[in-house]
């Protein structure tokens, strides 16, 4: 059951390490309209370290070994955009409407799996 969304990862070293660490499952933490969860063993190469994120961004916070998914305002937001508590490395983006995650605000766990890229036929 639950909500299923797809995300596309960027071609960065941090994103590749996250992909290799999958599948990952664990307790889901909520901070405003941000979900975050531990994904241990990933080195943060900080290619895109920033506090500027958009709704739908998937980011890694190396200091906490945490993957974050932004789907709305956070407690630090001044406007409509989410604001992370610290600099994060944007590693990907939700495909479709990230606001769908609002339906999972009471979820206790999250599972992130790999979807293998489509292989060309022929």
Positions of PLM-derived features:
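Hydrophobic alpha-helical positions that pack around
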Residues: 1
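Glycine-rich active-site loops that engage anionic ligands at enzyme catalytic sites
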Residues: 7, 11-122
């Amino acid at each position: 059951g639950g909500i299923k969304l797809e995300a596309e990862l960027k071609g960065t070293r941090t994103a590749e390490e996250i992909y290799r660490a999958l599948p990952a499952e664990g307790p889901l933490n909520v901070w405003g309209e941000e979900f975050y969860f531990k994904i241990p063993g990933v080195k943060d190469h900080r290619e895109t370290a920033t506090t500027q994120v958009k709704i739908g961004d998937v980011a890694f916070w190396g200091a906490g070994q945490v993957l974050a998914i932004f789907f709305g305002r956070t407690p630090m937001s001044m406007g409509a955009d989410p604001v992370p508590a610290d600099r994060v490395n944007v590693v990907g983006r939700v495909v479709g409407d990230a606001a769908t995650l609002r339906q999972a605000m009471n979820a206790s766990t999250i599972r992130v799996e790999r979807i293998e890229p489509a292989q060309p036929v022929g």
